[in-house]
Amino acid sequence: MLVDFSQASLWLTLACITFNPTAWNVAARREHHTRWLTNLCGGAKQGCYAIAIAIFSMGIIRDALYNQALNDQPTLSLLDNALVRLVAGLLFISGMIFVATSTYALGITGTFLGDYFGILMSERVTGFPFNVLENPMYVGSTMSFL
């Protein structure tokens, strides 16, 4: 069996993967229409930093659950070799470079939904990694999770 669907960790991880972006997008859209988080936190930048902390924290929980779910799943002996581990390591490192450099280029408010708070960048970011990939955060995250 390739996937053990009886593992609770699998279902909890899938729920978390689904819930997290839904929650922060609902919160951000509500912020855009009502400024509830701006008012609660005393300013747009503070509200954006608050949602950034929530998103980052939820991501850490998701990653821990994902790791546990993987550990609870059966392994495929075909993939248990040095070449696969090397490729996996290179994908992870490359993916993290794309994610980290994207975050650096965009800053906290550019990365974590600042536009919903009315915080806009003065110009489009075109340097690395955006000159290599159109969506380096999505591609980098996918590479890291493979």
Regions found by a protein language model. Give the residues of each.
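Membrane-anchoring alpha-helices and their flanking helix-loop junctions
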Residues: 1-132, 139-146
